Design a protein with these regions (language model features):
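Active-site core of metal-dependent hydrolases
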Residues: 193-258
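Histidine-rich, glycine-flanked metal-binding segment
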Residues: 4-32, 38-85
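Hydrophobic alpha-helical scaffolding
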Residues: 95, 122-126, 162-163, 223-226, ...
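Divalent metal-coordination and catalytic microenvironments
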Residues: 37, 53, 58, 81, ...
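Di-metal (Zn2+ and/or Mg2+/Mn2+) metal-binding site signature of metallo-dependent hydrolases
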Residues: 82-104
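Divalent-metal coordination cores built from histidine and acidic residues
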Residues: 2-24, 28-29, 78-79, 83-84, ...
Length: 258
C-alpha cells in the first residue's frame, strides 16, 4: 500500500493500480478477505450469495464466490449474517452550510452507509480562496474514511458587483483540476445572466471557469432555479450545464427532466 493514497496523484494511482491488478490475479498477497452472506451487484440488480471481498491496502482487489480467490490472504474475517453493498454517496452537498468540519460530517454519515460526498464549496471558498481544497482534504489526510470530492464554486465571488476573500476564474479552476484528482468539476453555475448575457460583467469570468473545466475533462454542475420556459431549459443544457438540483415547484420537477 502507498501510505499517502488518501489523497492521490496520477503517479501514485498508477503505482496502486499496478499492484492491485497483481493482487486481483492472486500473484501478490492480499491484506484482508471479508466473507459475507450476500453481496449486491448494483448494475445487475441482483443479490449474489456467499461472496468474498479481497482487500489490498484501502482498495478492493477481488470479488467472487466464497473460497474462489486463488491468492494468499494475510487475514480473513467472516460475517455470514451480513450483506455487503457499495457505499452510498451524495453527488451534491454543502457540508460548509452545516457549520461542521469534515471529520464531524464523517462521524454522522458513515454509520449510515455514506462513504463519499461531492462538496459544492462556494460559501467557504469566498473566505479561504485558493486554499479551499486544503481545508477539505485535511481530515482525509489525517485518516478520515469519508471521501470528499471537491467542486470549486462558480460563485466566487457571487456576482461581478461583489468582492470576497476569493476569486475563481479560468486560471484558478484549471489549476484546481490539474493539481488534484479529488477535484471533479465546477460547482453549481447559478448566476444564469452571467452565462447567457455577453454584456454581463461576470460573463468572461464564468465562461473562463467553464472553459477550464471542459479543457480538463471535468463536469459542469448547474443550478437552474426558476427555469420553466422551454427556451431557458434548452439554453441551460446547450451551455453544457449537466445537472440541476434546485427545483422548487412541481412544474419544474416535471418540466426540467423532459
Amino acid at each position: 500500500m502507498i501510505e499517502d493514497d488518501l489523497i492521490i496523484s496520477a503517479h501514485d494511482e498508477v503505482a496502486i493500480r499496478q499492484r492491485l491488478l497483481l493482487v486481483a490475479m492472486g500473484r501478490e498477497p492480499a491484506d484482508l478477505a471479508i466473507e459475507v452472506g450476500r453481496l449486491l451487484a448494483v448494475h445487475a440488480n441482483h443479490w449474489m450469495e456467499n461472496q468474498e471481498i479481497v482487500i489490498s491496502g484501502r482498495r478492493i482487489a477481488y470479488v467472487g464466490p466464497l473460497g474462489s480467490y486463488r491468492g494468499t490472504v494475510a487475514k480473513r474475517v467472516s460475517y455470514p449474517q451480513l450483506s455487503a453493498v457499495p457505499g452510498f454517496g451524495e453527488v451534491h452537498k454543502h457540508i460548509e452550510s452545516t457549520h461542521l468540519t469534515p471529520e464531524y460530517e464523517a462521524a454522522l454519515v458513515l454509520p449510515r452507509g455514506n462513504t463519499w460526498t461531492c462538496e459544492a464549496s462556494h460559501e467557504f471558498a469566498n473566505v479561504d480562496g485558493t486554499r479551499n481544497t486544503e481545508f477539505w482534504q485535511k481530515a482525509r489526510l489525517a485518516g478520515s474514511p469519508l471521501k470528499i470530492f471537491i467542486q470549486p464554486g462558480s460563485a466566487v465571488p457571487p456576482s461581478a458587483w461583489e468582492e470576497s476573500g476569493g476569486y475563481y476564474g479560468y486560471d484558478e479552476q484549471k489549476q484546481f483540476l490539474r493539481d488534484d484528482l479529488s477535484v471533479t468539476g465546477l460547482d453549481e453555475v447559478m448566476d444564469w445572466p452571467s452565462v447567457w448575457d455577453p454584456d454581463n460583467p461576470g460573463y468572461a469570468r464564468m465562461w473562463g471557469m467553464i472553459r477550464a473545466t471542459f479543457e480538463m475533462r471535468g463536469v459542469v454542475e448547474g443550478h437552474g432555479s426558476g427555469l420553466v420556459d422551454p427556451h431557458d431549459i434548452s439554453a441551460f443544457a446547450a451551455a453544457g450545464l449537466s445537472s440541476d438540483h434546485e427545483v422548487w415547484a412541481l412544474d419544474e420537477a416535471w418540466d426540467d427532466p423532459k
